[in-house]
Amino acid sequence: MTSETSVNLLDFDAEGLVAYCGSLGEKPFRAKQLQRWIHQYNAGDFDGMTDLAKSLREKLKGRASIVMPDIASDHVSTDGTRKWLIDVGNGNAVETVFIPEETRGTLCVSSQAGCAVNCRFCSTGKQGFSRNLSTAEIIGQLRMAEFALRASLGRAPGPNGKAERVVTNVVMMGMGEPLLNYSAVVPAMRLMLDDNAYGLSRRRVTLSTSGVVPMMDRLGAELPVALAVSLHAPNDALRDELVPLNKKYPLRELMAACQRYLKVAPRDFITFEYCMLDGVNDTEAHARELLAVTRDVPCKFNLIPFNPFPESGLIRSKPEQIKRFAQVLIDAGVVTTVRKTRGDDIDAACGQLAGAVKDRTRLAERTGAAGKIIEVRAV
């Protein structure tokens, strides 16, 4: 544990670290050195930072720390998907998932413990909202995953270029609504993009939002990365039921915001995510309606087979119905993919493991036991 006055350096992007070093009487280049040690060499303390002046290392030892999130469990699926459960205190946990593919490795990162948006089909929303994650807790997920994966492959830490990097893409699609934690998410994404940290391109960092229109505009002005929008319905009446935020920012406003974002986006399309729910939003008529509502937004569709959980009362669309729905979109000339289900054997659907932790914690509170996260592993 660190002292109450200790500063966690993982909370700083480049600008913040320069300012912090300045407060110690140090020049800006020291911040770059420090950032490389932390994010490229995986340094956990200051003694090994040999190109820093000893006087600076001593200053840092008394004032700063590098504190990573605590890993509660680490699960590896038979298909190679790897999922970490991160303990963020007070019985709360978030999830980080790595999805390996032949030409890339994608890390799905969480931004909040729980979620206040409360989409009907999302198990995270049913847990309620606990708190925003800090920048350190967000970028810490990438730092933890990158170096754990490198170690498993026998690759040493260090800025060894793209050939050595395991995580090639980051998607802010884990637990929480990223744009409702803007002040912590944006510095974390700046570190993802920084050549003195993880060096990802803007095209390889994707933020997924349920449609917080004012913050979409702000993101476009300040840090336009690739954008995905959780759409899930082709009209306001249905989307009001599935995504309650739609009552505040209806489809007309959302589509206009998407058009504005595309003027500055690193990609020339928006990805619309669409959870396929049997008998709710999956008819061919819904698909045609979807084409109409998105007609002025260059886009592609990512159809997501629903991951059932007991409280939802919803059922996954049948494979043949998903295929028919997709064909309507494809026939209209829109690129459409169906998300492949990954990591079923380790509950890799977002929110499932953390939801189990939440349930155990609530049970412990009722029975008077300590609310400690219990490690569980796939067998």
Curated annotation (Swiss-Prot):
Main location per the UniProt record: cytoplasm
Residues at which S-adenosyl-L-methionine binds: G176, E177, S208, S230, L231, H232, N307
Disulfide bond recorded as keyword: yes
Cellular compartment(s): Cytoplasm
Active site: residue positions: E95 (proton acceptor), C350 (s-methylcysteine intermediate)
Binding annotation for [4Fe-4S] cluster: C115, C119, C122
GO terms under cellular component: cytoplasm
CDD domains: Radical_SAM
Manner of cofactor binding, per the entry note: Binds 1 [4Fe-4S] cluster. The cluster is coordinated with 3 cysteines and an exchangeable S-adenosyl-L-methionine.
GO molecular function: 4 iron, 4 sulfur cluster binding; metal ion binding; rRNA (adenine(2503)-C2-)-methyltransferase activity; rRNA binding; tRNA (adenine(37)-C2)-methyltransferase activity; tRNA binding
Keyword 4Fe-4S assigned: yes
Cofactor(s) recorded in Swiss-Prot or TrEMBL: [4Fe-4S] cluster
Keywords: 4Fe-4S, Cytoplasm, Disulfide bond, Iron, Iron-sulfur, Metal-binding, Methyltransferase, rRNA processing, S-adenosyl-L-methionine, Transferase, tRNA processing
GO process annotations (BP): rRNA base methylation; tRNA methylation
Pfam families: Radical_SAM, RlmN_N
Domain Radical SAM core span(s) in chain numbering: 101-345
Matches recorded under InterPro entries: Aldolase_TIM, Methyltransferase_A, RlmN_N, RNA_MTrfase_RlmN, rRNA_lsu_MTrfase_RlmN/Cfr, rSAM
Catalytic activity: adenosine(2503) in 23S rRNA + 2 reduced [2Fe-2S]-[ferredoxin] + 2 S-adenosyl-L-methionine = 2-methyladenosine(2503) in 23S rRNA + 5'-deoxyadenosine + L-methionine + 2 oxidized [2Fe-2S]-[ferredoxin] + S-adenosyl-L-homocysteine; adenosine(37) in tRNA + 2 reduced [2Fe-2S]-[ferredoxin] + 2 S-adenosyl-L-methionine = 2-methyladenosine(37) in tRNA + 5'-deoxyadenosine + L-methionine + 2 oxidized [2Fe-2S]-[ferredoxin] + S-adenosyl-L-homocysteine
Family, similarity comment: Belongs to the radical SAM superfamily. RlmN family.
Other notes: Reaction proceeds by a ping-pong mechanism involving intermediate methylation of a conserved cysteine residue.
Biological function: Specifically methylates position 2 of adenine 2503 in 23S rRNA and position 2 of adenine 37 in tRNAs. m2A2503 modification seems to play a crucial role in the proofreading step occurring at the peptidyl transferase center and thus would serve to optimize ribosomal fidelity.
The protein's name in its UniProt record: Dual-specificity RNA methyltransferase RlmN
Species: Burkholderia cenocepacia (strain HI2424)
Gene that encodes the chain: rlmN
